[in-house]
UniProtKB/Swiss-Prot annotation:
SUPFAM superfamilies linked: Ankyrin repeat
Pfam families recorded: Ank, Ion_trans
Motif Selectivity filter mapped to chain: 665-668
Organism: Gallus gallus (Chicken)
Underlying gene: TRPV4
Gene Ontology MF, one: monoatomic cation channel activity
Note on domains (UniProt): The ANK repeat region mediates interaction with Ca(2+)-calmodulin and ATP binding. The ANK repeat region mediates interaction with phosphatidylinositol-4,5-bisphosphate and related phosphatidylinositides.
Protein name: Transient receptor potential cation channel subfamily V member 4
Keyword line: ANK repeat, ATP-binding, Calcium, Calcium channel, Calcium transport, Calmodulin-binding, Cell junction, Cell membrane, Ion channel, Ion transport, Lipid-binding, Membrane, Metal-binding, Nucleotide-binding, Repeat, Transmembrane, Transmembrane helix, Transport
Taxonomy of the source species: Eukaryota, Metazoa, Chordata, Craniata, Vertebrata
Membrane topology recorded in Swiss-Prot or TrEMBL: Multi-pass membrane protein
Highest taxon of the lineage: Eukaryota
Subcellular location: Apical cell membrane; Cell junction, Adherens junction
Length: 852
């Protein structure tokens, strides 16, 4: 009998028919099968391995090709196995047991297995050939999501064997086109994912490195986003450097719906470019790397699909909070200075977007007061880029200094759209009254008022009143006999003719001046028509009525009188426009505007519905009037009853007037006698009076009181805005040469340009005092405070025109006065026409006094 432990007949096992098929299961085990060097596991381990094998590959080796939905729904795979070629049904991974004919046969086989080997017999079976692992999108995405580099073993062999790449459609997310690289970047652990370098190495070996790195999202929501965008958003500089070194596109544009402004349905607009994303997320270290790396540098002058540069993007994300304004302004200066050093011939701040807006104009249009104030008051001490400053100190003496503000883009003198016009004429800017109080805007408006605004305004008041008096006289003393046009024979007739000509000319003048403002420049929306452009709209209607009146008069139509009286009423109402010149009456006109276009409009809309509904019901209760046939020819004195005794064809319109009289308490109930059901008629009338006279009228009074209260609280700001509008209206009415004559400011040489030539700019001077920072004024132009003749800077001698000679004599008394009661905080007080009390009131949040 053979020795049970003698393995001599081991060679016969391979050819034995009773060889168990379950012993081949170890060929498919990857992670759980020990290496040959490891000791063999006992029977419990083998049983556990079979159990795990069933759980791992449950459903993985079904007959036939897998269904697509099964691949999509699969999420976790412990091991990846390539299905072998079509096999027989018994070639299964599951252990169904060994086929045995008789128990003794099994016993005999076991004794032969352990017999001692015989010399020259066949050795053990060689190691099985390596099995190629299979990878698909769910498996690959799961591996990179877990950050398991071991799971990527065999991926390169699989791709090379099947001639595939990681950018193929089978490895992309169907809905977004996302590859495994963005998936890995979106699943970082402590800022790292060890599968990313392996994926890049595999892509490089398969020959599609750039395509793999720059593969964008293709869905509508995230279209254009690349792995570089995600690495920047995740604030991973090491991966940003790795991607750029491998060839990432530093100018890729993310244009999906998610990356659009909020008012267009988006969530976060950052300017589409990777550099803009780094700037808008406050990552200066990445900004420095993208613009200074030795592989591919990002161009600071690059614009997105809207034409916005990185500076526009910073303005777009500003929200006027302290934290946001602090980092936005710091990043803004960083990029501006960096661009000036990298591209000396380009002023990044002067580039316009597709809407024709610079970053400064965009800040004004969107009401970003924090970044707006920073731009117009920017002062740079670095001599190499000092030409980027918009504020220059002319002289300083202790806490007092005189500053020169660059007026480029602020006040363009009609040559192009200015920031001042954007602030005044754009009603969508909710905080524009605050932005108008920022220096030098505030002092600039005062200077315009002193130079030409006040005189022109009062001349306009007198001229308009004279024109309206003439219009009233020609309407009152018009001829009563004969059809128009009336003859001109006497001196009075010729005076009337002169008055008619003057009235017609004023109508034509108002027509052309206001049609330009309404439909070309000032009023882009309906709200602007009825709020900011209310008087322009009324003047336009008045001019149309005057022109129509003249046409009907010359055409011999007597109905010209009906049109003329409407024009006369509207003309006198338009005189309220000139109440803007004084604070006392200016606030009153604003109250009237808001009540008319807000409260009264809503009241009339509801009241009209009530009146039509009740009139229809009440008229239906009246008995119809008898027809004219009821009076026979024998009754010559027969008279037909009419309203209010009965209902005829004119009853509805007459009844509407009666209901209005009831609303104001002047009506009667004569029609009650002719009602078919007097009780129902009385009930309807009582409910109508309650709803209109008691409810609606009192609601109107309450709303009007609320509006008056709101206007009173903001009367200073609202009136100042109207005052600024009046100044610009007067300036825009001047021809271009007069605008240049009355332009505020002075031409000053503030230093040297980038090419070494004198940097001459049109600046506006504002005297200020700062009690916290003394002797810290860098870059002062003039050594002698208050000197107005000449000054030296960079070796150039310049003459300053139109500089006030008595400036120093007015500054010193103000400083002495301020020194009596000065707060300890950092206070900058403009020393123009603004008083000391106004400066303190602004600092403590109170309403300052009138600038006039």
């Amino acid at each position: 009998m053979a020795d049970p432990e003698d393995p001599r007949d081991a060679g016969d096992v391979l050819g034995d028919d009773s060889f168990p098929l379950s012993s081949l299961a170890n060929l498919f085990e990857v992670e759980d099968t020990p290496s040959p060097a490891e000791p063999s596991r006992g029977p419990p381990g083998a049983v556990d391995g079979k159990q795990n094998l069933r759980m791992k590959f449950h459903g993985a080796f079904r007959k036939g090709p897998p269904k697509p939905m099964e691949l999509l729904e699969s999420t976790i795979y412990e091991s990846s196995v390539v299905p072998a070629p079509k096999k027989a049904p018994m070639d299964s991974l599951f252990d169904y047991g060994t086929y045995r004919q008789h128990p003794s046969e099994n016993k005999r086989w076991r004794r032969r297995v352990v017999e001692k080997p015989v010399a020259g017999t066949k050795g053990p079976a060689p190691n099985p050939p390596p099995i190629l692992k299979v990878f698909n999108r769910p498996i690959l995405f799961d591996i990179v999501s877990r950050g398991s580099p071991d799971g990527l073993e065999g991926l390169l062999s699989f791709l090379l064997t099947h001639k595939k790449r990681l950018t193929d459609e089978e490895f992309r997310e169907p809905s977004t086109g996302k590859t495994c690289l963005p998936k890995a970047l979106l699943n970082l652990s402590a800022g790292r994912n060890d599968t990313i370098p392996i994926l890049l190495d595999i892509a490089e070996k398969t020959g599609n490195m750039r395509e793999f790195i720059n593969s964008p999202f293709r869905d509508v929501y995230y279209r254009g986003q690349t792995a570089l965008h995600i690495a920047i958003e995740r604030r991973c500089k090491h991966y940003v450097e790795l991607l750029v070194e491998k060839g990432a596109d530093v100018h890729a544009q993310a244009r999906g719906r998610f990356f659009q402004p909020k008012d267009e349905g988006g969530y976060f607009y950052f300017g589409e470019l990777p550099l803009s994303l780094a700037a808008c997320t406050n990552q200066p270290h990445i900004v420095h790397y993208l613009t200074e790396n030795g592989h591919k540098q990002a161009d600071l002058r690059r614009q997105d699909s809207r034409g916005n540069t990185v500076l526009h993007a910073l303005v777009a994300i500003a929200d006027n909070t302290r934290e946001n304004t602090k980092f936005v302004t710091k990043m803004y200066d960083l990029l501006l200075i960096k661009c000036a050093k990298l591209f000396p011939d380009t002023n990044l701040e002067a580039l316009l977007n597709n809407d024709g807006l610079s970053p400064l104009m965009m800040a004004a249009k969107t009401g970003k007061i924090g970044i707006f104030q920073h731009i117009i008051r920017r002062e740079i001490a670095d001599e190499d880029v000092r030409h980027l400053s918009r504020k220059f100190k002319d002289w300083a003496y202790g806490p007092v200094y005189s500053s020169l503000y660059d007026l480029s883009s602020l006040d363009t003198c009609g040559e192009e759209v200015s920031v001042l016009e954007i602030l005044v004429y754009n009603s969508k800017i909710e905080n524009r009254h605050e932005m108008l109080a920022v220096e030098p805007i505030n002092e600039l408006l005062r200077d315009k008022w002193r130079k030409f605004g006040a005189v022109s305004f009062y001349i306009s008041v007198v001229s308009y009143l004279c024109a309206m008096i003439i219009f009233t006289l020609i309407a009152y003393y018009r001829p009563m006999e004969g059809p128009p046009p009336y003859p001109y024979t006497t001196t009075i007739d010729y005076l009337r003719l002169a008055g008619e000509i003057i009235t017609l000319l004023t109508g034509i003048l108002f027509f052309f001046s206001n049609i330009k403002d309404l439909f070309m420049k000032k009023c882009p929306g309906v709200n602007s028509f009825f709020i900011d452009g209310s008087f322009q709209l009324l003047y336009f209607i008045y001019s149309v009525l005057v022109i129509v009146t003249a046409g009907l008069y010359l055409g011999g139509v007597e109905a010209y009188l009906a049109v003329m009286v409407f024009a006369l009423v509207l003309g006198w109402m338009n005189a309220l426009y000139f109440t803007r010149g004084l604070k006392l009456t200016g606030t009153y006109s604003i109250m009237i505007q808001k009540i008319l276009f807000k409260d009264l409009f809503r009241f009339l809309l509801v009241y009209l519905l009530f009146m039509i509904g009740y009139a229809s019901a009440l008229v239906s209760l009246l008995n119809p009037c008898p027809s004219s046939e009821s009076c026979s020819e024998d009754h010559s004195n027969c008279t037909l009853p009419t309203y209010p005794s009965c209902r005829d064809s004119q009853t509805f319109s007459t009844f509407l007037l009666d209901l209005f009289k009831l609303t104001i308490g002047m009506g009667d109930l004569e029609m009650l006698e002719s009602a078919k059901y007097p009780g129902v008629f009385i009930i309807l009338l009582v409910t109508y009076i309650i709803l209109t006279f008691v409810l609606l009228l009192n609601m109107l009074i309450a709303l009007m009181g609320e509006t008056v209260g709101q206007v009173s609280k903001e009367s200073k700001h609202i009136w100042k805005l109207q005052w600024a509008t009046t100044i610009l209206d007067i300036e825009r009415s001047f021809p271009l040469f007069l605008r240049r004559v009355f332009r505020s400011g002075e031409m000053v040489t503030v230093g040297k340009g980038t090419d070494g030539t004198p940097d001459r700019r049109w600046c506006f001077r504002v005297d200020e005092v700062n009690w916290s920072h003394w002797n810290q004024n860098l870059g002062i132009i003039s050594e002698d405070p208050g000197k107005s003749d000449t000054y030296q800077y960079y070796g150039f001698s310049h003459t300053v025109g139109r500089l006030r000679r008595d400036r120093w004599s007015t500054v010193v008394p103000r400083v002495v006065e301020l020194n009596k009661s000065c707060p300890t905080e950092d206070v900058v007080v403009p020393l123009g026409t603004m008083g000391t009390a106004e400066a303190r009131e602004r600092r403590h949040g109170q309403t300052p006094s009138s600038p006039l």
